Regions:
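Pre-Walker A (pre-P-loop) alpha-helix and adjacent loop at the N terminus of AAA/AAA+ ATPase modules
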Residues: 3-45, 224
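Conserved alpha-helical scaffold flanking the Walker A/P-loop in AAA+ ATPase domains
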Residues: 25-29, 82-102
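Walker A/P-loop
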Residues: 31-68
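Canonical AAA+ ATPase core
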Residues: 83-88, 109, 121-198, 203-213, ...
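Walker B catalytic acidic pair
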Residues: 41, 104-105, 116
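AAA+/P-loop NTPase substrate/partner-engagement loops
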Residues: 57-85
Length: 314
């Protein structure tokens, strides 16, 4: 069942997101692994459309927050207001009470407002005036930021960055893919015509199935060697945390599930390592050239020998 549902989701989103097969697979990996996504790319590359396409495909409630410097934490979480008719305080839910939340241009809001998302992302709950309210599963945050604009922005703190399972960019379209996009959007509105292919209950079942994906003991040691290497590398000031190790684990399990397997293979590590680990590294000043973190992760993967086994064996 899992294979059919995930294949239907991939095909449905691809009706709108032309030429982004890898990104679609990684977004679905985050969804089944219960992880959040940071999409960093220039405007107009389809970040918002990706989030909306996913929400429509899984029959999920979609919420969007346009982050600005004057946005308040209560604009994210909601607030209590006094109802004159009833003479009582009433809670008004904020846009974070949804299944898929698009946090657009998250780095334009102040750190105080950014941190209001932290409890939502980490604990999947919201506390306002001492009252804690759980968020409905599935709950996925897709945050976006523009890497080219830094004026008037507030860089995400490390604690917030560590809460994102993956940091992704949209894929550049080939001439053939761009031609296909023009032809499709010339006479159609693919996003408006997109319909749901699975209910939220099936997504919750996929998230449970992700935890059961088999990881061979040799691959457990392979994972450990990768994260340990980030802590002793001379180019890295601060390596992957234990939370990052567990995120890496869930990501490889999720990617295996998206690929139609109930067991992890070494290729899963190679596919998700950079999106999962690079944004968790603090580089030495002398080594940071913009892509240094990605390059170091790739070097580590190339340096560590791949174990060879029958990965599906129990």
């Amino acid at each position: 069942m899992e294979n059919n549902v995930l294949q239907q989701l991939k095909e449905n989103i691809a009706k709108v997101m032309i030429g982004n097969e890898r990104t679609i697979e990684l977004v679905l990996t985050c969804l089944v692994a219960k992880g959040h996504i940071l999409l960093e790319d220039v405007p107009g590359t389809g970040k918002t459309v990706m989030a909306k396409s996913l929400a429509k495909s899984v029959e999920a409630e979609f919420g969007r927050i346009q982050f600005t410097p004057d946005l308040l934490p209560s604009d994210v979480t909601g607030l209590n207001y006094f109802d004159a008719k009833s003479g009582e305080f009433v809670f008004s839910k904020g846009p974070a009470f949804c299944n898929i939340l698009l946090a657009d241009e998250i780095n334009r809001a102040t750190p105080k407002t950014q941190s209001s998302l932290l409890e939502c992302m980490a604990e999947r709950q919201i506390t306002v005036d001492g009252v804690t309210r759980p968020l409905e599963e599935p709950f996925l945050v897709i945050a976006t930021q523009n890497p080219l604009e830094t004026l008037g922005t507030f860089p995400l703190p490390e604690a917030q960055m560590d809460r994102f399972l993956m940091k992704l960019s949209m894929e550049a379209l080939s001439p053939a893919e761009e031609t296909q996009m023009i032809a499709r959007f010339l006479t159609e509105e693919p996003l408006a015509e997109l319909s749901s292919v699975c209910p939220k209950e099936e997504i919750r079942a996929l998230q449970e199935a992700c935890k059961e994906v088999y990881l061979h003991p040799e691959l457990v040691q392979y994972l450990v060697r990768i994260v340990q290497e980030t802590r002793v590398n001379s180019k890295i000031a601060s390596g992957v945390s234990p939370r990052g190790t567990l995120a890496f684990l869930r990501a490889v399990q999720g990617h295996a599930l998206v690929q139609g397997r109930n067991y992890v293979v070494p290729e899963d590590f190679k596919t998700v390592a950079v999106p999962v680990l690079a944004h968790r590294l603090t580089m030495q000043i002398s080594a940071d050239d913009g892509r240094a973190a990605e390059s170091v992760i790739e070097e580590i993967l190339n340096r560590i020998d791949l174990p060879t086994e029958n990965w599906s064996g129990r």
